[in-house]
Amino acid sequence: RGFTRLTKEIWQFEAPFDIRFRDLMAHTVRHLMKCGFNVVYGYSESDEISLLLRRDDDTFKRKTRKIISVLAGEASAAFSVAHGQTAAFDARVCVLPNEKLVVDYFRWRHEDSYRNALNAHCYWMLRKKGDSVSRATEAVSGLTRAQKHDLLFEHNINFNELPAWQKRGFGVYFQTALKEGFNPKTDETVQVKRQILHTDFELPLGDDYGVFVLERIV
């Protein structure tokens, strides 16, 4: 809540993107995926987090108000403790009736991240050159996507070469990993499978991302 003011004016993170803030958000997503809900995929762009729960998740008997309050509280606590300063998250629940709408939702978020990143880089480039808030906002709002790319390129910024996480956000999901264990019955070292959280800063694009999300639905 109020993250734009907090990040740019009070905490003074680098604009438009700061890897320190990204890592705080990644920490928060990982916490939410281990705090008691059956979350199979977490996605974050900017200061927003989207969680995909298992179809059969019955945490708090699926009571929407309870889910919202607990997840918002967990996110707020995890971020605040990691950062050392207070932050507050709100939350909402979207109940989607089929797999297509789930995929569409995450693809929309993916595309929204791209649009926001392009606008943010243009806006903050102009601000750092000395433009006022109103002048920079007006200048960016009247440009097409291609013109925004050109504007950045004129100032030695190739948007296509910027880090993927800035343009498309990042995902967190479970992967199976082999780890070395010990079998006391046979007195042998064995390989065991474990589910570990993986943070992916290079998500696939377009239709490939749709397939990726579909594979996470269980």
Task: Put a short name on every predicted segment.
Residues R1-V218:
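Regulatory and interdomain segments flanking nucleotide-handling catalytic cores
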